[in-house]
Amino acid sequence: MEGADLLTAGVLFLFAAVAAVPLAARLGIGAVLGYLLAGIAIGPWGLGFISDVDEILHFSELGVVFLMFIIGLELNPSRLWQLRRSIFGVGAAQVLLSAAVLAGLLMLADFLWQAAVVGGIGLAMSSTAMALQLMREKGMNRSESGQLGFSVLLFQDLAVIPALALVPLLAGSADEHFDWFKVAMKVLAFAVMLIGGRYLLRPVFRFIAASGVREVFTAATLLLVLSAALFMDALGLSMALGTFIAGVLLAESEYRHELENAIDPFKGLLLGLFFISVGMSLNLGVLYTHLLWVAASVVILVVIKMLTLYLLARLYGIRSSERMQFASVLSQGGEFAFVLFSTASSQRLFQGDQMALLLVTVTLSMMTTPLLMKGIDKWLSHRLNGPEENDEKPWVEDDKPQVIVVGFGRFGQVIARLLMANKMRITVLERDIGAVNLMRKYGYKVYYGDATQVELLRSAGAEAAESIVITCNEPEDTMKLVALCQQHFPHLHILARARGRVEAHELLQAGVTQFSRETFSSALELGRKTLVSLGMHPHQAQRAQLHFRRLDMRILRELIPEHSDMVQISRAREARRELEEIFQREMQQERRQLDGWDEFE
């Protein structure tokens, strides 16, 4: 693709995203489906603005690559080891069972047995990009079903390697003398990457961070991700797997959050490009000529994968209310099918329109998932939020609440219990199905739903409520909800949970002054007790705690413009020295005053 054509394609992609995604959100069908429809519109079978789909699709895989790097940052090696049973147990069972059933059906549809095996394996895979995106949107990533879903996706990425190696063997074109030397060199190169990354990455990023230039840090992060992807691609392995490993190696480093912040904007944009490219690849000509075959294939594919996943979730012990979400979010075909089927086609395994039919089936199955998840959400909302079957009076009246509490994790539970103990009328919203079921057993009136949806807030009583307390786990959800309330319910008094200083800065910039850093108050209290244990009078320790809180908050406000810049490091050091000096002067003055308390703890 020439430079001018590339620029034109970029403009078209951005225009399609800007036009389609807000429209999709307004229609309530989700951003992912909006991207897919935008791709169909501008692709060769739509308006025909872009015709070179294969090249763009390969480039757009970088969105999946960046996503897997961020996921790797969220998992340390010990956590990955804890997931080994679900990865190699449930993940392997899903791929093998689904592939076997689908391959059998393809043989009944006049596919050669070799082509049926490849087709079954390809269709058994799910879309990593779509599933992870939907799991984040639905709040599944921290639930048991979300963890199991991630394990299945990770095994599927690992299965890419043997699946690609199987194609030439099935085609009968494999060398009689297998080149073990090449295999050994690939294994050696992979080992070098692991060992080198384990011992070199942190010193390298420490050196780069010392420069204090954020742009260089961002460039180094991009270099790491793209190099890992290129290296794995050269070895014939999954690019996404390479960047995932790089993320895991840096998961325990002090630069984890900075790395995530540097990558996040690129990840979102490239993921959108990936979904648009998938939509562009939909061959409407094949769809028109084989409409019944394709429609039946999509339904059969989704149903078989859902049944398999539901059965495995039940055997694994997932709660019944979470099984449908787990089965639905992984029910589509995936991006790996494009690679596997292209490889099989080059080996002449497919006949006639067989490859085109399979690719159309995969693409359409991806379009069904957002709609399926939306339908299941409505069903779960009706099931969980409907009238109680028993006559027990709920703790919380849901009509005209004074306060809406968003999130009912450990943080939100403390707040809700305090409010209920003081006879406040509250409505609690939670999107973790397991938490909703568990808390309802204890008598709490908790409602299932995504609070970032305006209609849900309105039905929860936001127009009549006085305050909203936001205790979301994800900072992105918190900021989205803040903006939503400020736009649609400006009368609400917003109180929010901040996980750390960065989130506190973002809340202050958004105009939210009432927030609590989740570990700050408890850390201060433990610090006060430590001072008392070292011999300080409780009165002085209490005053020291109050001084520290006030001065730290002042410095927090002063650093607002610099919270996203590496300059904050040097300013924070200066602020710490200033804090110590002011604190020392005030405490010296305090010691000259009479003690207010006489009793020690």
Curated annotation (Swiss-Prot):
Interacts with the regulatory subunit KefG. HAMAP family: K_H_efflux_KefB (MF_01412). Pfam families: Na_H_Exchanger, TrkA_N. Belongs to the monovalent cation:proton antiporter 2 (CPA2) transporter (TC 2.A.37) family. KefB subfamily. This is Glutathione-regulated potassium-efflux system protein KefB. One of its GO terms (molecular function) is glutathione-regulated potassium exporter activity. Coiled coil: none annotated.
